């Protein structure tokens, strides 16, 4: 599996998290988060983190938010990041996400995405 494949799969997973949070299906949400954790492990094991730091940040932050058990915040974060993998597919740039990022930070604080 290469980084492009991982990015496509993670994009699907982020969309699932957004959807399953919205419909409040805890079992399917857990499955989607488990898939993301598997891809995170693969990225770490294959030492791909330096190639996709924004993606690694999004994964780690998503799990931090999931631990807070704030469904609205998790939905909003997944909504903001679901297309982030497109950066590594050459479809978008980080700057093209400023509206999504700014909207999320306006609601939940500007500590998010500062490291990027």
Region locations from a protein language model:
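Short terminal alpha-helical segments
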Residues: 1-40, 105
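Short, solvent-exposed, charged loop/turn and helix-capping segments
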Residues: 41-65
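Short, charged, amphipathic alpha-helical segments
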Residues: 26-34, 53-57, 75, 79, ...
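Amphipathic alpha-helical binding modules
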Residues: 70-116
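Short helix-adjacent coil turns
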Residues: 23-27, 50, 69-73, 92
């Amino acid at each position: 599996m290469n980084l492009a494949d991982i990015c496509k799969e993670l994009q699907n997973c982020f969309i699932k998290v957004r959807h399953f949070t919205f419909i409040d299906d805890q079992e399917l949400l857990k499955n989607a988060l488990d898939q993301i954790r598997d891809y995170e492990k693969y990225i770490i094991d294959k030492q791909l983190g330096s190639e996709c730091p924004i993606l690694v940040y999004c994964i780690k932050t998503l799990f931090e938010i999931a631990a807070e058990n704030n469904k609205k915040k998790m939905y909003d974060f997944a909504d903001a990041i679901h297309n982030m993998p497109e950066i590594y597919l050459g479809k978008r740039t980080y700057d093209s996400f400023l509206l999504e990022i700014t909207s999320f930070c306006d609601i939940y604080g500007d500590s998010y995405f500062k490291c990027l």
